[in-house]
């Protein structure tokens, strides 16, 4: 007799393993981007890829499904990067993958290259910094009362000095600066640079 077989039905492995959920960028610096995602209970681990040189390249593969964070280092400042993550499950020597989830992240704009402080008198200190061509202006903050408080915001990137007055004599003060760039309704900030200055006794 003759046996008739039906056509094969192909089941994609990815349909059996759900895509990674809540994938997002959680923190950025001028050279790092940290990616995080939710745990996939059915996965063995996760594969993280970066788009570079015109193609996708695997930059990390976790060995378990409890590692839910990865920091990509060595990046250029003020640059947008594309990443994608997928879960994988290995069983019986066979590895199945979920669909990809894509994420984009942008590194921070650079900060000023130099930030210094000097005592002017018993009640004032002068802060100086180098020009940042990528900035619209700068925000200067002082640490007082247990927290950082903005004490000046420049309206341009050519103002490169600020004198802080009304200070106590012979006292050390902490200051920090960050660059900002305004484009339309969007404002981007750099990381901080800090300095400690003591007034004249």
Regions picked out by a protein language model, each given a short descriptive name:
Residues 1-2, 52-55, 91-93, 144-147, ...:
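Solvent-exposed strand-loop boundary residues in beta-sheet-rich modules
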Residues 34, 50-51, 60, 72-73, ...:
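Short, surface-exposed linear motifs at loops/turns and structural transition points
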Residues 66-70, 90, 158-162, 182, ...:
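Repeated polar recognition positions within modular binding domains
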Residues 20, 37, 48, 72, ...:
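An aromatic-rich alpha-helical recognition segment common to small helix-rich domains
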Residues 1-3, 72-91, 164-184:
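Beta-strand-rich modules
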Residues 40-60, 67, 84, 100, ...:
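Extracellular low-complexity, O-glycosylation-prone stalks/linkers
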Residues 3-41, 77, 94-134, 169, ...:
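Pro/Thr/Ser/Gly-rich low-complexity, intrinsically disordered linker/stalk tracts
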């Amino acid at each position: 007799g003759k046996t008739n077989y039906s056509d094969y039905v192909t089941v994609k492995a990815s349909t059996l393993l759900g895509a990674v959920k809540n994938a997002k960028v959680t923190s950025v610096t001028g050279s790092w981007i940290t990616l995080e995602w939710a745990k996939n209970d059915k996965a063995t681990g996760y594969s993280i890829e970066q788009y570079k040189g015109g193609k996708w390249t695997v930059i990390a593969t976790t060995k378990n499904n409890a590692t839910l964070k990865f920091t990509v280092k060595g990046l250029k400042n003020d640059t947008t990067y594309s990443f994608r993550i997928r879960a994988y499950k290995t069983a019986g020597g066979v590895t199945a993958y979920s669909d990809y989830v894509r994420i984009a992240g942008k590194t921070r704009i650079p900060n000023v290259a130099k930030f210094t402080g000097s005592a002017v008198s018993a009640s004032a200190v002068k802060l100086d910094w180098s020009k940042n061509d990528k900035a619209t202006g700068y925000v200067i903050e002082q640490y007082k009362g247990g927290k950082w408080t903005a004490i000046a915001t420049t309206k341009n990137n050519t103002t490169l000095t600020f004198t802080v007055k009304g200070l106590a004599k012979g006292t050390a003060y902490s200051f920090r600066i960050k660059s900002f760039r305004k484009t339309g309704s969007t404002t981007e900030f750099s990381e901080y640079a800090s300095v400690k200055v003591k007034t004249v006794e």
